[in-house]
Amino acid sequence: MRQALPLVTRQGDRIAIVSGLRTPFARQATAFHGIPAVDLGKMVVGELLARSEIPADAIEQLVFGQVVQMPEAPNIAREIVLGTGMNVHTDAYSVSRACATSFQAVANVAESLMAGTIRAGIAGGADSSSVLPIGVSKALARVLVDVNKARTTRQRLTLFSRLRLRDLLPVPPAVAEYSTGLRMGDTAEQMAKTYGITREQQDALAHRSHQRAAQAWAEGKLAEEVMTTYVPPYKNPFAEDNNIRGASTLADYAKLRPAFDRKHGSVTAANSTPLTDGAAAVILMTESRAKELGLRPLGYLRTYAFTAIDVWQDMLLGPAWSTPLALERAGLTMADLTLFDMHEAFAAQTLANLQLLGSERFAREVLGCAQATGEVDDAKFNVLGGSIAYGHPFAATGARMITQTLHELRRRGGGFGLVTACAAGGLGAAMVLEAE
């Protein structure tokens, strides 16, 4: 085993996560219909600052992410600074790592803290699947550029005459991998077939996710970390995630048809995470800065790991790669964890990763490790449900998981938690958290 690499500043300060907050998550075209991601980001950061009672000028950096990019606001982070009353001199930039985007934002702020260039920052992400950048065809785009340079009406008409009717149709954002043409659901189907994961197993995991999430809301466990939002026409508050199906039964899941491989598949809309709108953010500081401000941190970021694998086959195995690396850097084993939280993009993807974490063969032949990372204890796994139930605004999910896990660790008296996610492009992310 290599030497552990816990995250501390040059002065020995740990990286403190002081607080975290998110909007409720809304299914596509429901409560946040028409609300762009930048406005969702402003909502959550503004409320996070108001609740924390931290002086606005104490925040020296904001790193924020958005996966579904809006051309009119390419640097969502800077727009949030300008739209929330933060100090205009606050450094702000945007990141994107697909479904692990807010993991990356947190890592970037942590690195600034370790470098000593800042003492406090905000990291997070927002996405809207209801406000999409609808584009134009490549043929129309090329003609429009040429028309802009044409000097006469005749030249412009000649250029437009080259277009066919199909060239005028709007082009929605791509849902497939650029390099392979595969949709995420196609990859989930690959994984189900490769690792022998049945439809019944997938439906059971999805049902478990919804039941746990519904119970978490019923017991008031999420009230402190989810804000109440008001959106036009401002008639009704939106305060709870609207995707959770607490009253569903396993029989309900069995009724749905496969969504991707319609003839032989097992991945359905019910055992996959839905398209979702929402935002989430966390405040990070050096441990000494938190003490100066009289703040008790939610917990600490002990370490993290990012990994990448090939995209052609089973590319959503990021957690099986990033988890052992993060544990090694933290100087921990699976047995040391109090909680283990994995992003549920699909039930098939989640179950495949769990299978490989406990596989001696995968550890030896693929990772080059002497032993398996370890079986994940069901009593520690996604104890409050996961993305299948809550939904998945791509750039916000990591910050949701971090905040949720730290609150639950506090309720349990402290300990270590690991949060991990797969991401498009064969990427993986894992972070080890600590609460006292």
UniProtKB/Swiss-Prot annotation:
Keywords: Acyltransferase, Cytoplasm, Fatty acid metabolism, Lipid degradation, Lipid metabolism, Transferase
Enzyme class: transferase
Entries under SUPFAM superfamilies matching the protein: Thiolase-like
A Pfam family: Thiolase_C
Keyword Transferase included in the entry's annotation: yes
Active site, renumbered: C99 (acyl-thioester intermediate), H392 (proton acceptor), C422 (proton acceptor)
Gene3D superfamilies from the UniProt entry: 3.40.47.10
GO CC annotation terms, alphabetical: cytosol
Molecular function (Gene Ontology), one example: acetyl-CoA C-acetyltransferase activity
InterPro entries assigned to the protein according to its UniProt record, in alphabetical order: Ac-CoA_C-AcTrfase_FadI (IPR012806), Thiolase (IPR002155), Thiolase-like (IPR016039), Thiolase_acyl_enz_int_AS (IPR020615), Thiolase_AS (IPR020610), Thiolase_C (IPR020617), Thiolase_CS (IPR020613), Thiolase_N (IPR020616)
Domain of life: Bacteria
Record's keyword annotation contains Lipid metabolism: yes
Subcellular localization, as worded in the UniProt entry: Cytoplasm
Reaction equation(s) it catalyzes: an acyl-CoA + acetyl-CoA = a 3-oxoacyl-CoA + CoA
EC number assigned by the record: 2.3.1.16
Pathway linked to the protein: Lipid metabolism; fatty acid beta-oxidation
GO biological process terms, semicolon-separated: fatty acid beta-oxidation
Subunit details: Heterotetramer of two alpha chains (FadJ) and two beta chains (FadI).
Family: Belongs to the thiolase-like superfamily. Thiolase family.
Function: Catalyzes the final step of fatty acid oxidation in which acetyl-CoA is released and the CoA ester of a fatty acid two carbons shorter is formed.
Name by which UniProt lists this protein: 3-ketoacyl-CoA thiolase
UniProt source species: Salmonella typhimurium (strain LT2 / SGSC1412 / ATCC 700720)
Upper classification of the organism: Bacteria, Pseudomonadati, Pseudomonadota, Gammaproteobacteria, Enterobacterales
Gene of this entry: fadI
